[in-house]
Structures are given as C-alpha cells and as structure tokens.
Amino acid sequence: MERPESAIDLAHLRHMTFGDRALEAEVLRLFDGQAATLIGKLSSADTETVIALAHALKGAARGIGAFAVASAAERLERSSDGYERECAVGHLTTAVREARAMIGDILQAA
C-alpha cells in the first residue's frame, strides 16, 4: 500500500524526542498502541466518547508529528452525527493506518 512520506513528520518527532533514537522508538510504540486501541473503540462509542477519543488521538498525534492523523481527529471531533461522522471516522482510520505503517517501518529499521 502506498502511503505519503509525511504520515509522520520525522523532523518534528526528532525535535520532540531531543534526537534520542531510543526515546523516539518508545514514543512511537506508545502511540502505535494507543492509536490502535482508540480506533478500535470508535465504532461502538457514543457521541461524547467519540469526541473524547478523537481529542486524545489528536493530541498524541501532534506530539509525534502525525499531522494527518491530528487533522483527521480534529475533523471527527467537530463532526455531526450521521454521514459526516462516518466519513470523518473513515478519514481518521486511513490516516492512522498510514501512520502505523510508517511507525512499523521506522521501528523495523531501528
């Protein structure tokens, strides 16, 4: 599957981890697990919980430079119920999948 190289802004990640590769790997592992858990909870969550999950994911994504995930999470956070929310969940799921794939590549290369 093709994914944008910008799924994670590596310069931002390195800045946030002070260039410490071990810390970078740890932060990426934490985000990877958190993102998988939060995405898994979205389908059965009520509106209030969806907003809280999207907000949590938005903050975590910004911290590692996964700006497409953060943007998609913010879109979900602001979405209305129904079709708009379904589309926002789809965009977020795709962005998370791309970020997690890049994380896998980064961790495998480390």
Q: How would you name each of these model-derived features?
A:
Residues M1-A11, A22-K41, A60-R75, G82-A110:
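Amphipathic, coiled-coil-like alpha-helical segments
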Residues H12-F18:
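Short hinge/gating elements
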Residues T37-A52:
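Helix-loop segments that flank and shape redox-cofactor active sites
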